[in-house]
Structures are given as structure tokens and as C-alpha cells.
From Swiss-Prot:
GO terms for biological process: DNA replication, synthesis of primer. Pfam families: DnaB_bind, DnaG_DnaB_bind, DNAG_N, Toprim_2, Zn_ribbon_DnaG. It comes from Buchnera aphidicola subsp. Schizaphis graminum (strain Sg). GO terms for molecular function: DNA binding; DNA-directed RNA polymerase activity; zinc ion binding. Binds 1 zinc ion per monomer. Binds two Mg(2+) per subunit. This is DNA primase. Mg(2+) 1 binds at E264, D308.
Length: 579
């Protein structure tokens, strides 16, 4: 990426970003001394081991060794690539990315995204204007019970049956039409006739977390337009498997929702919201993905699924459970609402009203109850064969859960269900030993040079204590070139913190050792760091003098020294005597 997004811009982004505030938009932090702590979002953390340093603009987990700066956090937590994480920070700070001339591919993608945002927004406004003048669309929404407040809140629109009439009505320019065709927002048939993909449909805009419109969903209002439901084609800003409909609207009202209620369709979301059921979203159908699960858990600790009361809905609930199991933890849980046959959230809220539906939410089945309710279907517990097949089917699913507590709890229920009550017999159901990564800090030896580099990485302002490096140049001491390289970078960038320093070296050959040393516990108290750094620097210089002294002494024994060399060894002896 070097040479594509300028390093000065990346550094400026990190300088503007407060990593504590950024992480707190995703997870709750608690102040602990000068740092902030919480349970690690990257592994099943029983005690808070995730530390965020405002001073260093750096995070580190003592449990799983996850670490990095603001960019790394977005890459790992939001599942973004490097460029996407830069785009996210740039959006937060409302600044454009100044791609340089070498970054042609990235720049084209970035500009294409900006163009798509613009086109989607403009089309959405046209759809919204159009619905005002379309009696059939208004009649349909009225029959579905959707009021004007919801139409406005969710920016609902309508696409006319004929593009030429639509374009004339709103005076759409040819250049705009060409852009829409180029980005496949509208299309042409084999006869060259332009048509809107969503023609004859109610249009539901889909927003990203920043409120930008990234795609549309359409619902036909007559039986002769098929398919009944339609989504935009995937593009650079829209990936169906990663989007949650209604999440932006929920977050507008509740920055940290206590739960999220997942339903199947747009109208389910809208109707429940209209009836004052909070926190409702949709995964754009029943095809839930692991990305959906991860996104939902980033915004809340409890996700409740409420699919339609038919075979497709029940199958979707079971499929969702299986996909979600690896992401369940002691703090992240899922629940299920099972609706009566042939009911969906839209129909049942109209029959029952808000209070009764809220009771369904309050009494939603826990994950464990739903799991055993489904897995015990058609199982004859009086049959040893059935009990065996039950355990064969259940155990692999239970083993997907990372939480020891939940996994053991489910195994105990399974053991009791199949009639195993003796602890010794139950051993075969106990969890496999969890492999814990050996902390990187124990994989490398403590050496003076590594401590020197580690202190500098963790405290870049120490560079101001070194007025000159001439006496260290051209010396062959292991690690010294790395130290001098970092020292120069810190001197050239006096305001760098640890996070910015690591970002500077993201694509260099030394980044791995720098990452290790950035989180290395050197066990030196803060008040003594400066003196320790200077002592190590002095000792390094002494080591250089000693090596030169040995070389001159060896030469003297073999062939003697020149006058200049004799003066040099005298000077070295004098300096070393002052140690």
C-alpha cells in the first residue's frame, strides 16, 4: 500500500483519531489508572484483559495477544481491509483521501464508491418524490397499515413502471442517466429500451452505518410483477451478506441497543417499529451469514431471532443457531421467538398489539432451550441407538462454542438427557483442552538491545535524548541498525506515538519484531524509563568502544599501531575508565 495512500495522510488520520473514543463506539471501556480496560472482543475473555492506552494510542490483550493501533482495530473488529479502514476513519473525520498518482487502482475504487453513494442518494430522493404522486403505491402501503411517519422515517419510495415517463416527470438529465446505466442501477433490454430494475415496486433504501444509501430492496405491488422481492445487484458499496436493514435507524435512536430483534423482511421491520417495538432489524431474508452474526454482536450482547411461522422460518432459525454457535460467549447470547403457524411479525403485531408482542420478546427461548427443543425432535430416548445418534449429532455442534461455561452446561444437559449421571462416565463429554497461544513475550530473550528498542517504540519521545548517532554508525552490533532506523523516524516525527510509529512500518520487514517489542513487558517503572534508556545507550556505546579496543590491541600484537591508532586507543581507554 506504500505509495498509494500517502503516509502523511495516514499519520494525520491517526493523529486526529482518539483510539479510546473509537473503540468505545464499539465496546464499553472502563478506566483503570491511566489506561482503559474491558473484556477482549477477539476471544472468550473471562476477566478484562483488553487494555487501551490513550497515551500510546495502542491496544493490547494480555489473553490472546491481539494488539495494534486504530487502523488495526477496525481491520480486526469491523472485518475491513486496510483501505476500507482508512476510508472508515476518513469518513468519521469528514476528510477525503488524497491518493497519490501511483495509487490508481485504489483511487478508482474510492472514486467509484463516492459516485455510487451520490447516485444511490439521488435515486432514493426521486423514488421518495415519486411515491407522493403514485396512488397505487400509497394505496398498497395504506392496506399494509404503514403510516406516513414510517414512510418518511425509512425513506420509502416507488419506482414507476416505465422509465421514460419517470425520467420525464423528474427531468432526469442524459449524463445522469448514463451514470445510472454505467453503474447498473438501471438497465437496457435486448431492444435497447431502458428500464429500472425496481419498476412497479415499492423501494426500500438500505443504509450503511453512516446513513449513506448503499442499495435498494423492492417489493412488487401487483401479482403480475415477479419476483415479488428484489434486491440491488452487489457492487463496491453493497454486499448483501454483510448488511443489516434497519440497523442505521435503530442506532439513530439507541447508540447502544440492549438487544436486536432480527426479522425476515422490510415490512416486518417497519410494522414492528410503527407499533413501538424497539431494536428491530432484518438480515435481508432468511439467509443469515457469519458476517451478519458478527455485525449484530458488535452492536449488542443479545440477538433475538423472530422468523416467520412456517417451515422456511423454522428451518432458518435452526440454520441461524448453527452459524451463530462459534460466536456465542459468556457475554454474547442469542434467543428465538417461535411464531404460530402461518404468522409473521407483520401479521401477528396487528392481531396482538404491542404489549402481547413485547411479552413474546421477554419470553423468547434461550439458546439452550431452543437447541434441545429442536435436536430432540423425533428422538426416542428409550432407544440406545437413538441416544447414541443424538450424542453424535449434538456434540459436534456443542463443541463449536468457545465458552467453556456454556459448552459444559450444554454437555451436562445432554448427558442427563441420555441418562449419564456419573461424573466418570461424563468425562467423555467434557470439553477438549483449549489451546492457549503462548504469549509472544516469552518467545524472545531479554537483551539490552531489544530492551532499548522496546523502550523507544513504547516511548517515541525518548528520541529527543539522543543528540547525535554518528558514534553508532557503521558498527556491527545485532539489532543496532533497527534501533538507529527507528530513532531517526522518531526524531523526524517528534509527535509520533506508538500507534503511529507501528503504522509507519506496517509494510516493512521489521514490523513483526516491532509489534512484539511494542507490547513487551520490560518491567521498568515509568519514573525510571528515561534513566534506563540512557544507561542502555551508554552501555551500547561502551560495547562499541570495547570491540574497537580489542581490535586495536590484536593489531598491536601482530604488526603494531600507527600514531593515530595509538592516540585512538588512548582515548578509548580514557572513555572506558569513566564507565
Amino acid at each position: 500500500m506504500s505509495g498509494k495512500i500517502p503516509k502523511y495522510f495516514i499519520n494525520e488520520l491517526l493523529f486526529r483519531t482518539n483510539i479510546v473514543e473509537l473503540i468505545e463506539t464499539r465496546i464499553k471501556l472502563k478506566k483503570n489508572g491511566k489506561n482503559y480496560q474491558t473484556h477482549c472482543p477477539f476471544h472468550n475473555d473471562k476477566t478484562p484483559s483488553f487494555t487501551v492506552s490513550y497515551e500510546k494510542q495502542f491496544y493490547y490483550c494480555f489473553g490472546c495477544s491481539a494488539h495494534g493501533n486504530a487502523i488495526d482495530f477496525l481491520i480486526n473488529y469491523d472485518n475491513l481491509n486496510f483501505v476500507e479502514s482508512i476510508e472508515e476513519l476518513a469518513t468519521i473525520h469528514s476528510i477525503e483521501i488524497p491518493f497519490d498518482k501511483k495509487g490508481t487502482i485504489e483511487k478508482k475504487i474510492y472514486l467509484k464508491k463516492q459516485k455510487l453513494y451520490f447516485l444511490m442518494d439521488k435515486m432514493s430522493k426521486l423514488y421518495q418524490k415519486n411515491i407522493i404522486f403514485t396512488n397505487s403505491a400509497n394505496k398498497y402501503l395504506t392496506e399494509r397499515g404503514i403510516n406516513k411517519n414510517m414512510i418518511d422515517f425509512f425513506c420509502i419510495g416507488f419506482s414507476s413502471n416505465k422509465w421514460d415517463l419517470f425520467s420525464k416527470q423528474f427531468n432526469i438529465k442524459k449524463d445522469f442517466e448514463k451514470d445510472l446505466l454505467h453503474y447498473k442501477i438501471i438497465s437496457t433490454n435486448k431492444n435497447g429500451y431502458i428500464y429500472d430494475t425496481f419498476q412497479g415496486r415499492i423501494v426500500f433504501p438500505i443504509h450503511d452505518q453512516h446513513g449513506r444509501i448503499i442499495s435498494f430492496g423492492g417489493r412488487s405491488i401487483t401479482n403480475n410483477i415477479l419476483p415479488k422481492y428484489l434486491n440491488s445487484h452487489e457492487n463496491d458499496i453493497f454486499h448483501k451478506g454483510k448488511q443489516i436493514y434497519g440497523l442505521y435507524q435503530v442506532k439513530k435512536k439507541h447508540s447502544k441497543p440492549k438487544y436486536l430483534l432480527v426479522v425476515e423482511g422490510y415490512i416486518d421491520v417497519i410494522m414492528l417499529t410503527q407499533y413501538n417495538i424497539e431494536y428491530v432489524v432484518s438480515s435481508l431474508g432468511t439467509s443469515i451469514t457469519k458476517e451478519h452474526i458478527q455485525i449484530l454482536f458488535r452492536h449488542t450482547n443479545t440477538v433475538i431471532y423472530c422468523y416467520d411461522g412456517d417451515d422456511a422460518g423454522r428451518n432458518a432459525s435452526w440454520r441461524t443457531l448453527k452459524i451463530a454457535l462459534p460466536y456465542i460467549s459468556d457475554k454474547k447470547n442469542i434467543k428465538f421467538i417461535i411464531l404460530p403457524n402461518n404468522e409473521d411479525p407483520d401479521t401477528i403485531i396487528k392481531k396482538e398489539g404491542q404489549k402481547k408482542f413485547q411479552l413474546r420478546i421477554d419470553n423468547a427461548l434461550t439458546m439452550s432451550k431452543f437447541f434441545f427443543k429442536n435436536i430432540l425432535k423425533n428422538v426416542d430416548l428409550s432407544s440406545d441407538d437413538d441416544k447414541f445418534h443424538l450424542s453424535v449429532r449434538a456434540l459436534p455442534l456443542i463443541n463449536c462454542i468457545s465458552s467453556d461455561t456454556i459448552r459444559i452446561y450444554l454437555r451436562q444437559i445432554l448427558a442427563r438427557t441420555i441418562g449419564i449421571v456419573d461424573d466418570y462416565q461424563f468425562e467423555k463429554f467434557l470439553y477438549e483442552k483449549e489451546r492457549k497461544k503462548k504469549s509472544l513475550q516469552f518467545q524472545i530473550k531479554h537483551t539490552p538491545m531489544r530492551t532499548l528498542i522496546g523502550l523507544l517504540i513504547q516511548n517515541p519521545n525518548l528520541a529527543r535524548l539522543v543528540p547525535s548517532t554518528k558514534k553508532f554508525e557503521n558498527e556491527k552490533i545485532q539489532g543496532l541498525p533497527i534501533f538507529l532506523e527507528i530513532l531517526k523516524t522518531c526524531s523526524d516525527n517528534p509527535n509520533f506515538n506508538t500507534g503511529q510509529l507501528l503504522e509507519f512500518y506496517r509494510y516493512s520487514k521489521i514490523i513483526n519484531i516491532l509489534k512484539i517489542l511494542s507490547k513487551w513487558d520490560h518491567m521498568i517503572i515509568k519514573e525510571k524509563i528515561q534513566n534506563m534508556f540512557l544507561d542502555l545507550l551508554k552501555n551500547t556505546y561502551s560495547k562499541i568502544l570495547e570491540k574497537r579496543q580489542e581490535k586495536l590491541i590484536a593489531k598491536e600484537r601482530i604488526q603494531g599501531l600507527t600514531i593515530d591508532e595509538k592516540k585512538e586507543i588512548w582515548s578509548i581507554n580514557k572513555k572506558l575508565s569513566k564507565k
